[in-house]
Amino acid sequence: MFKKLIATAVATVLLAGAALADPIEGFWQTEADDGAFAFVEVVPCGETYCGTIVRTFNADGEYESPNIGKMLLIEMAPQGGGEYKGNVWRPSNDKIYIGKVTIDADVMKMRGCIAGGLLCSSQTWVRLQ
């Protein structure tokens, strides 16, 4: 009986930990940019979140991009309400933008700006299951 109680308690703690994961954490598919898209893994990095390219695809299928392992989302700090602020790297022009991310269930809306917010670009990513 005691072993069952311990096993139930451990399972409850493990499941609660998974349920408490931040909404931004996980694997996401980027929107196509210059004909290519990527799978990005978002994980905690200190008190913020970072997203690293783990797989890349183009019209011919999966390919070994030199961008694999590079960080797209940089130090995204939670702002509450599913919003995050940090920096976003755009591989197609190798520029870093001031970034804002909003998570709504399995959709990530991202906006990257330069020149104090005068020039902005946006993308919508979807969570991979």
Briefly describe each language-model feature range.
Residues L15-A21:
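Sec/Tat signal peptide C-region and signal peptidase I cleavage site
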Residues M1-K4:
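Positively charged n-region of N-terminal signal peptides that target proteins for export
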Residues Y97-S121:
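Short, exposed beta-strand-loop hairpins at the edges of beta-sheets
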Residues T8-A9, A19:
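Cleavable N-terminal signal peptides
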Residues L128-Q129:
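Short, solvent-exposed mixed-charge patches
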Residues I24-Y97:
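Central antiparallel beta-sheet cores of small beta-barrel/beta-sandwich binding domains
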